[in-house]
Amino acid sequence: MSKGFSNGTNIKRVRKSGFRARMSNSSGRKILNSRRRKQRKKIAL
């Protein structure tokens, strides 16, 4: 079972490279779209 992201270091990871962080600016949205194009299973953390 996964731990979620309540641990200290994981909060930093999620804030920097999580889905909502990527959606917050245009370059992040470009990253998500390129990962969707490659059909990645995970598009964000």
Swiss-Prot record:
State the GO CC annotations. chloroplast; ribonucleoprotein complex; ribosome
Its domain of life reads Eukaryota
Query: Compositional bias (Basic residues) spans?
Result: 32-45
Which InterPro entries did the record assign?
Ribosomal_bL34
State its location(s). Plastid, Chloroplast
Q: Which GO terms describe its molecular function?
A: structural constituent of ribosome
Q: Which UniProt keywords apply?
A: Chloroplast, Plastid, Ribonucleoprotein, Ribosomal protein
This protein's record includes keyword Membrane? no
Keyword Ribonucleoprotein annotated: yes
Q: Which HAMAP family match?
A: Ribosomal_bL34 (MF_00391)
What protein family does this chain belong to? Belongs to the bacterial ribosomal protein bL34 family.
Cross-referenced NCBIfam families = rpmH_bact (TIGR01030)
Q: What is this protein called?
A: Large ribosomal subunit protein bL34c
Gene for this chain = rpl34
